[in-house]
A protein has these predicted regions:
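Acidic, serine/threonine-rich low-complexity intrinsically disordered linkers/hinges in large eukaryotic
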Residues: 1-8, 14-23, 36, 53, ...
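Alpha-helical solenoid scaffolds in large eukaryotic transport, assembly, and signaling factors
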Residues: 1-4, 10-83, 105-109, 185, ...
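HEAT/HEAT-like alpha-solenoid repeats
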Residues: 4-10, 40-51, 75-88, 113-125, ...
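Short inter-helical turns and helix N-cap capping residues of alpha-solenoid HEAT/ARM repeat scaffolds
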Residues: 18-19, 54-55, 91-94, 128-130, ...
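Hydrophobic residues within the alpha-helices of tandem HEAT/HEAT-like
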Residues: 30-34, 65-71, 104-110, 139-146, ...
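Solenoidal tandem-repeat scaffolds enriched in leucines and small polar residues
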Residues: 124-273
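WD40 beta-propeller repeat blades
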Residues: 161-200, 205-210, 288-293, 341-344, ...
């Protein structure tokens, strides 16, 4: 106990010392203890006294301590307000000091202090230094989050930021004004970022003057303008399209989002083709990056292709996988291949998918085999070639390949009834290899559906009845359906005995309510009127439509508006996974906590990459 007291006393002695080095050492020790969860709030009065130092490094450390304990000790924090106001009003001093003071006051999060911040903030928004102005713009959003009336009505900060969008000449300040207005829109539940043609041109003129992070904010502002004239559309395309070749993935995706939106308004088909040709190389470049960046690019390409398939209609080979790629990228490429497959490229696609069947990753192999079946359903003229490919894969005698091929063939038989019955022979030869419930269910369905054409259908069906009680629901329900169909079609003694066994199980032993209820329904229906039962159960079923794996129109529109954000990764609207996002705002960017950050984290995309320094984390989150 005495040791701890002595240490605290030594730190206090250093804090009240007139030597800056001793003060810095003491505050660093305090912050180090603070970061590991120790309560050092008792030192608050002594730390606050150091705020008057002219040393910028020491001042930053003191501000960091005050921000951390402002909510815990709001009354003591008032002691630091005068010093903060003095630093914020030091117009002849260092602009970094003024900006730091304004930012610190905004981060305190104490409503009682917000009133004191308003006058320094008003000065900051009119400061001659752009760094101070950009810091002030973000503080407006912080004030609004705590006291909306104070920011909007009493001091008119919102109107001031809107004016700055047209008058401000510095790109960083413009970017932070846009960021603040978007954040306030999220809090308010109403979009207040109103961009007209004059503001849009002003933003475009500042687009190439700064770094990539600023460009992304400016592009977000530009994307809010909806042009009505072809001249405006053409000018916007001409001025932003150079950014599509940017090295930063966030800038590329932000530009593409705007271009795709503008293409919906373009009347000239030649312009559409020209813009799409310029978009393609940039996306291809992203696919040569690290696997994590590739995944983000693939997710966004998957959305883009549904909107504008012309972008990659002749470049399907780009999405062929190599064995060294991670599974998540290979699976995403398969989704894109399905959307791009056509009669012009079906042969090379089938050859590639056939090669994938020998991959070491079982999940990837099964998905590749499934895709062959989906191609058959999508392209009727290529169905024969797809079935032949599936039959060849069954002959490889690889169990999971056979099982996935049977599942795919079941869907093909439903799509094209009475067309590919020759493939049933190869299925009958591989019954013993089935251990997957879904594959078994698919085979049982095929036996029941074509029992009048399969030789010995009853003998094949009876093999699945011995352990019926231990089988999962999907097999039990399919055996019930197939046994009923087989009896109604064949009318043989064997099929009658099988049906009786299945009915006995369903009505007396089965614990699943769905199987039991259907068993009773079939039993009573066949007892009352077998002919009616035949018309109901053994009837011509509607052909399944093309397997649609895309997004519905509403979701696609939302994802296009949020291209390059986490919404495209989750494939959900932002309000579906961001709790603080207002439900009545659709197609808005995500809101994340901005405390202790210089910039509001406006648009996010996860880009994991290795850091060169060993002490830093291996994975980082780049904010775009």
């Amino acid at each position: 106990m005495s040791t701890s007291t002595n240490k605290a006393g030594d730190i206090i002695d250093d804090l009240i010392s007139l030597k800056v080095d001793r003060q810095k050492t003491a505050i660093k020790k305090i912050i180090s203890a603070m970061t590991i969860g120790r309560d050092v709030s008792k030192l608050f009065p002594h730390v606050v006294k150091c705020i008057i130092t002219p040393n910028l490094e020491l001042k930053k450390l003191v501000y960091l301590y005050i921000i951390n304990y402002a909510r815990v000790k709001p009354l003591e924090t008032l002691l630091a307000v005068n010093a903060l106001k003095r630093d914020a009003s030091d117009f002849n001093g260092n602009p970094l000091t003024r900006a730091l003071a304004v930012r610190t006051m905004g981060c305190l999060g104490v409503e009682e202090i917000m009133q004191f911040l308003c006058d320094p903030l008003k000065d900051a928004l009119n400061d001659k230094d752009p760094y101070v102005r950009k810091t002030g713009a973000l503080c407006v959003a912080k004030i609004y989050d705590i006291n909306p009336q104070l920011a909007e009505d009493q001091f008119g900060f919102l109107d001031k930021i809107k004016e700055m969008l047209e008058e401000e000449t510095n790109a960083m300040v413009l970017a932070n004004c846009i960021s603040a207005l978007i954040e306030i829109s999220t809090t308010k539940g109403k979009d207040i970022l109103e961009i007209n043609w004059s503001k849009c041109r002003h933003l475009m003129s500042a687009l190439h003057e700064n770094n990539e992070w600023t460009q992304i904010y400016l592009l977000e502002g530009i994307s809010r303008y909806s042009p009505t004239k072809q001249d405006e559309i053409n000018e916007m395309i001409e001025r932003i399209i150079p950014c599509v070749s940017h090295s930063n993935a966030g800038v590329v995706l932000s530009v593409i989002k705007i271009l795709i939106k503008l293409l919906d308004l373009v009347e000239n088909p030649e312009t559409i083709r020209s813009v799409c040709k310029k978009i393609t190389p940039s996306l291809v470049t992203l696919l040569s990056s690290e696997p994590e960046i590739q995944y983000v690019a693939l997710k966004n390409i998957n959305i883009l292709i549904q909107k504008r398939p012309i972008i990659f209609e002749k470049d399907i080979k780009i999405f062929f996988s190599s064995f060294t790629e991670p599974l998540y990228n290979k699976l995403e490429k398969l989704e894109i291949i399905y959307k791009l497959v056509s009669m012009n490229n079906i042969d090379i696609v089938l050859n590639e998918l056939k090669e994938y069947a020998s991959d070491v990753d079982i999940k990837f192999v099964r998905r590749s085999v499934k895709l062959i079946g989906q191609c058959a359903i999508k392209l009727e003229k290529a169905a024969q070639r797809c079935v032949e490919t599936l039959v060849e894969l069954v002959k490889t005698q690889v169990s999971f390949v056979i099982q996935e091929a049977i599942i795919a063939l079941k869907d093909i038989f439903r799509r094209y009834p009475n067309t590919f019955e020759g493939a049933m022979a190869i299925i009958n030869e591989n019954l013993r290899t089935l251990d997957d419930p879904e594959a078994k269910a698919a085979l049982i369905w095929i036996i029941g559906e074509y029992s009048d054409r399969i030789e010995g259908a009853e003998n094949q069906l009876i093999k699945f009845i011995d352990n019926l009680k231990e089988e999962p629901y999907v097999i039990q329900i399919n055996i019930l359906d197939s046994a009923t169909k087989t009896f109604l079609k064949c009318q043989s003694e064997e099929s009658y005995n099988i049906l009786n066994q299945v009915f006995d199980f369903c009505t007396k032993e089965c614990e699943d309510p769905d199987v039991r209820d259907r068993g009773y329904m079939y039993y009573r229906l066949m007892t009352i009127d077998p002919q009616l039962a035949s018309k109901i159960i053994v009837n011509d079923k509607p052909r399944i439509n093309e397997d649609v794996s895309g997004f519905d129109d509403n979701l696609l529109a939302i994802l296009m508006d949020n291209l390059g954000t986490m919404a495209t990764i989750y494939e959900k609207p932002p309000e579906a996974f961001v709790k603080k996002l207002k439900k009545n705002i659709s197609r808005m960017i995500m809101k994340v906590n901005m405390k202790n950050h210089n910039l509001i984290l406006m648009r996010m995309i996860i880009i994991c990459q290795k850091k060169k320094k060993k002490k830093k984390r291996r994975w980082i989150l780049l904010i775009i």
